[in-house]
A protein has these predicted regions:
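Bacterial N-terminal signal peptides that target proteins for export
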Residues: 1-7
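Hydrophobic h-region of N-terminal signal peptides that target proteins for export
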Residues: 12-20
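C-terminal beta-rich recognition modules with glycine/proline-rich loops and embedded aromatic residues
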Residues: 23-40, 69, 119-209, 224-244, ...
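Well-ordered alpha-helical segments within folded domains of soluble proteins
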Residues: 24, 43-60, 64, 69-74, ...
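Glycine- and aromatic-rich loop/turn segments at beta-sheet edges
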Residues: 26-49, 60, 77-93, 134-139
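Non-catalytic carbohydrate-binding regions of carbohydrate-active enzymes
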Residues: 68-141
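Beta-strand signatures of extracellular beta-sandwich domains
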Residues: 216, 244-246
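Short acidic, flexible loop segments centered on an aromatic residue
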Residues: 218-222
Length: 354
C-alpha cells in the first residue's frame, strides 16, 4: 500500500501541472482543490470516489457551485435546516435530487462563509444518503447514477485554500499537491474515517523549511455536541468531547478555534504531521417530532438503522450501547430495549442493500 501511495503521488504531481486545480468562490476567496487533483486512497465504503466509479467509470467532477447570495443563505436557514434529519436527508418526493441540491448549496455557502456547519451537512449527505443510494442493491438507475456523480463532486471539497493557507474540510484518506499563487505543498491525509477516528496529516513539498502557513481543520458539530437543527435533537448519551490536536507528537498550543475550525498557525517544516483522534462511540439521540419523541443512534457522522425495522425510532431504546465489528470490519451497534429485547444496528448507508 505504501509503494502504491508513492507511485500514485508521482503520477499526481505530473498531471497536476497540466490541469486547472481549483474552483473558486468570489465571496470569501476560498478555492476548492478540484477532485481531479486529489487521489483518494480509501478502500471499501470509505472510498467515495471508488464507490461512485463502480457505477460509472466515466464520472468526473462537475461544476456544482451555485451563484452565492444572501437569499441562498436565508433559504438554507429557513427551509433546509429545520427539515434536516440526522442522516442529512430532507426526504420529499425526490430525496436523492433534494440531497444533490443541498450538497451544492452546502458547498457554495461554505466557500462563501468558511463556516463548518455547511461541511457538516455535506459530510452527512455523502456518507449517509448518497452513499446509501450507490450501495443499494439492484440495477443501475437514474437516482443511483445521480448519487454517484454527487459522490465524485463531494471529493472536490475535501480541501480548500485561501491566501493564508490550507483548509481540511472532509476527513478522507487522500493525497493532493496544492499549488496556489501564494504557496505550494503536498498534503497526505491518512485515515479510515468515518469508521475509525484517527486522522494523520503529513505536509511536505513546501518551498523551504520554516514556511509560515495556517492550516485549518474542521472540528465537526458531532464532536462538539452540536446537533442540527438545535432544539429538534438532544443527546441522551454523554456527547462526544472535542479531541486534542497534536503536532509532531506534541499537543498543539498555538491553535485557535473559529467558525468550527481549529487553526494551526506556525512555520512548517517538510514532513511535519498533525494528529487528531476523533471520538467515535455510538450515541443515543432524542428526536422531538410531532409533539412526541423517538430515539435514534448516531456514531460520528453516521446515522444508524436498527435491524428490527418495526422498532426503528422506538423511544424505548435503552442504553448502554456497545460496538462490535462485522466480517468486513464495519462498526455495528448493539443494545437493548427497555423491555430487555436485544437489537443490532448498522450504518444507514447499508440499509438499502438488503
Amino acid at each position: 500500500m505504501h509503494l502504491k501511495r508513492i507511485a500514485g503521488l508521482c503520477l499526481l504531481l505530473l498531471t497536476l501541472s497540466l490541469s486547472a486545480q481549483t474552483h473558486r468562490s468570489p465571496e470569501l476567496g476560498l478555492r476548492y482543490v478540484a477532485a481531479d487533483s486529489v487521489v483518494v486512497w480509501g478502500e471499501g465504503y470509505s472510498d467515495l470516489r471508488g464507490m461512485a466509479l463502480g457505477v460509472d467509470t466515466a464520472l468526473r467532477e462537475t461544476a456544482t457551485l451555485l451563484p452565492y447570495s444572501k437569499r441562498l443563505q436565508k433559504d438554507w436557514l429557513k427551509h433546509v435546516v429545520p427539515q434536516l434529519a440526522l442522516s442529512g436527508c430532507r426526504g420529499g418526493t425526490d430525496p436523492i435530487q433534494t440531497a444533490v441540491t443541498d450538497l451544492a448549496k452546502a458547498k457554495t455557502l461554505f466557500a462563501a462563509t468558511g463556516q463548518a456547519q455547511f461541511m457538516d451537512a455535506a459530510e452527512r449527505l455523502l456518507f449517509n444518503v448518497l452513499l446509501r443510494e450507490v450501495v443499494a442493491s439492484g440495477p443501475g438507475s437514474f437516482d443511483k447514477h445521480t448519487a454517484a456523480q454527487a459522490l465524485v463532486d463531494g471529493t472536490g471539497c475535501i480541501y480548500a485554500t485561501d491566501g493564508d493557507g490550507l483548509w481540511i474540510n472532509l476527513f478522507i484518506n487522500s493525497t493532493t499537491h496544492v499549488k496556489t499563487a501564494d504557496f505550494s505543498l503536498v498534503v497526505d491525509q491518512m485515515t479510515d474515517m468515518p469508521f475509525s477516528g484517527r486522522v494523520k496529516v503529513r505536509l511536505t513539498g513546501m518551498p523551504r523549511n520554516g514556511f509560515p502557513l495556517k492550516v485549518r481543520l474542521r472540528m465537526p458539530g458531532w464532536v462538539t455536541g452540536q446537533l442540527v437543527p438545535a432544539g429538534k435533537y438532544t443527546y441522551i448519551s454523554t456527547p462526544p468531547v472535542a479531541p486534542t490536536v497534536y503536532i509532531n507528537g506534541r499537543e498543539g498550543l498555538n491553535t485557535v478555534f473559529d467558525g468550527g475550525y481549529v487553526i494551526v498557525s506556525r512555520a512548517w517544516n517538510r514532513g511535519d504531521e498533525i494528529l487528531i483522534d476523533f471520538p467515535l462511540s455510538p450515541c443515543l439521540v432524542s428526536h422531538t417530532v410531532d409533539g412526541g419523541s423517538r430515539t435514534d443512534i448516531v456514531r460520528g457522522p453516521l446515522f444508524y438503522a436498527v435491524a428490527d425495522s418495526c422498532a426503528q425510532g422506538n423511544a424505548s431504546i435503552a442504553g448502554p450501547l456497545s460496538e462490535m465489528r462485522d466480517a468486513a470490519d464495519l462498526p455495528l451497534v448493539t443494545g437493548r430495549y427497555a423491555d430487555g429485547r436485544a437489537f443490532t444496528a448498522w450504518p444507514y448507508f447499508l440499509s438499502g442493500s438488503e
